[in-house]
Amino acid sequence: MINLIPMTVRGAEKLREELEQLKNVKRPRITVQIAEARKHGDLKENAEYHSAREEQSFCEGRIQEIESKLSNSQIIDITKISNDGRVVFGSTVTILNIKNNAVFTYQIVGDDESDFKKNLISINSPMSRGLIGKTVNTIAIIHTPSGNVKYKILKIDYI
């Protein structure tokens, strides 16, 4: 049995948009570049040709990677799943660092969607693992390389 990769609806949409761009814009553009470069003669020393072929290889590899991710993903719509007021995949969590009173808001997403600068954290991150299953006003102890950090869950959104 294949393990499905959890992915938010937004994450799947972004991958589909990228796939469409690669297939309908980039791939045809590269094909034209290769045809143009072939017109320049000897392919052994044709830098434009080799550059276009390399770009084609990267493009085709990315297309295969995205198609594989989408076919092996479990797309989860957070607005349609039961959560019982708990932190679950896809939820947005506002937490308070008990030690320094810093407040953070993160959304728990799939590995491929995570972007710490955008406050999107991977379901497999230590932070997510410590928050999953918790409810508002509970304390989550997050294990970090520099020691354990306590966070109070202030708010959970399912958007």
UniProtKB/Swiss-Prot annotation:
Query: What is one Pfam family matched by this protein?
Result: GreA_GreB_N
Question: Origin, by domain of life?
Answer: Bacteria
Query: Which residue stretches, if any, does this entry annotate as coiled coil?
Result: 7-72
GO molecular function per UniProt: DNA binding; RNA polymerase binding
- Keyword DNA-binding in annotation: yes
Give UniProt keywords alphabetically.
Answer: Coiled coil, DNA-binding, Transcription, Transcription regulation
Q: Which InterPro entries does the annotation name? A: GreA/GreB_C_sf, TF_GreA/GreB_CS, Tscrpt_elong_fac_GreA, Tscrpt_elong_fac_GreA/B, Tscrpt_elong_fac_GreA/B_C, Tscrpt_elong_fac_GreA/B_fam, Tscrpt_elong_fac_GreA/B_N, Tscrpt_elong_fac_GreA/B_N_sf
GO BP annotation list: DNA-templated transcription elongation; regulation of DNA-templated transcription elongation
Q: Function of this protein? A: Necessary for efficient RNA polymerase transcription elongation past template-encoded arresting sites. The arresting sites in DNA have the property of trapping a certain fraction of elongating RNA polymerases that pass through, resulting in locked ternary complexes. Cleavage of the nascent transcript by cleavage factors such as GreA or GreB allows the resumption of elongation from the new 3'terminus. GreA releases sequences of 2 to 3 nucleotides.
Q: Which family does it belong to?
A: Belongs to the GreA/GreB family.
Its name, as the record gives it, is: Transcription elongation factor GreA
